Design a protein with these regions (language model features):
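Acidic, glycine/proline-rich low-complexity segments that act as flexible tails and inter-domain linkers
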Residues: 1-90, 128
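Glycine-rich anion-binding loops and their surrounding alpha/beta cores
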Residues: 9, 105, 128, 132-134, ...
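Glycine/serine-rich anion-binding loops at beta->alpha junctions
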Residues: 79-102, 106-118
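Short, glycine/charge-rich beta-strand/loop segments that flank catalytic centers
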Residues: 77-81, 113-119, 139-145, 157-160
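Generic structural signal for well-ordered, non-membrane alpha-helical segments
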Residues: 3, 14-21, 36, 40, ...
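Short alpha-helical "patches" and their helix-cap loops
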Residues: 55-66, 113-115, 198, 202-203
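Buried hydrophobic packing segments
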Residues: 47, 60, 97-104, 122-125, ...
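Active-site-proximal loop->helix
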Residues: 115-131
Length: 260
């Protein structure tokens, strides 16, 4: 098996097997990769134009999860939830909604990442005011038990392949490929063993997805993959045709969230 065969197969619109997808993820994201950046870029571009079946997307999500460890939260009592937004201009909802859910008695566990494309991620916003989101699983568990919530950056042990793939996607114009977004988002959500997963799927000029039809298609894709993993989830499709709130920019968005 070699990457050239996989690129050609996907370029022809054919379905890849689980073994082939595992080969791509493992060989490109390992410490000494046998797949070069330009070969990975070619493969990802083929995925962008030819798409992936639900089975392929499931395999890619699974391979990303299996590249690292899962985060077991069973030692924490109560209902544990994870909330994720696909991102939009001025989107600071996670910073507001998380503490509100804790006030209602829920436990909020959020594994986050930097923003892709033109939207700032939750980690970017917190980093702008000096909040340290780099912590061990042990420290995150302490926070969850003590205050009912944590927002942490991806650790090297959780979905390490996703960090590598996000970097190459951001540099090659493949950020908007739906199967790649799906695998990236859900791998982190599924690796974190919460009871429920809530996703805010945005569309419009301020989001990476420009219309409702595409958002609905993506939402259905994510729900199908979640069901294949036997995880409970809910997806809200929300309009992002204007900025959320009255501030745009990481630091002032945090200030707006605090003043909400």
């Amino acid at each position: 098996m070699n990457i050239i065969d996989l690129i050609n197969k996907k370029s022809d619109g054919k379905e890849l097997s689980e073994q082939e997808i595992n080969f791509f993820v493992n060989e490109y994201t390992k410490k000494n990769p046998t797949i070069t950046d330009y070969q990975a870029a070619s493969f990802l571009m083929a995925v962008k134009f030819k798409g992936m079946t639900i089975k392929e997307t499931y395999y890619l999500t699974k391979a990303t999860i299996n590249s690292g460890d899962v985060f077991d939260l069973s030692s924490v009592s109560g209902i544990k939830i994870d909330k994720h937004s696909t991102g939009g201009v001025g989107d600071k909802v996670s910073l507001i909604l998380g503490p509100m859910c804790v006030a209602l008695g829920l436990k909020v566990a959020k594994l986050s990442s930097i923003g892709l494309g033109h939207t700032g991620g939750t980690l970017d916003k917190l980093a702008s005011i000096g909040v340290n989101t780099v912590m061990s699983n042990h420290q995150a568990l302490i926070n969850l038990k003590k205050v009912g919530m944590f927002i942490m950056a991806q650790t090297p042990s959780i979905c390490p392949a996703d960090k590598v793939l996000c970097s190459i996607r951001n540099a090659t114009g493949t950020v908007q490929a739906l199967p790649l977004i799906c695998a990236s988002v859900l791998s982190k959500k599924i690796a974190l063993k919460t009871d429920y997963i809530f996703i805010d799927l945005k569309y419009g000029s301020g989001a990476f997805m420009d219309n409702a039809k595409k958002a609905i298609e993506f939402g259905k894709m994510m729900m199908q993959v979640l069901k294949m993993f036997k995880r409970k989830g809910l997806i809200h499709i929300t309009c992002m045709k204007q900025p959320l709130g009255r501030s745009i920019g990481n630091t002032i968005e945090v200030r707006s969230a605090i003043n909400f």
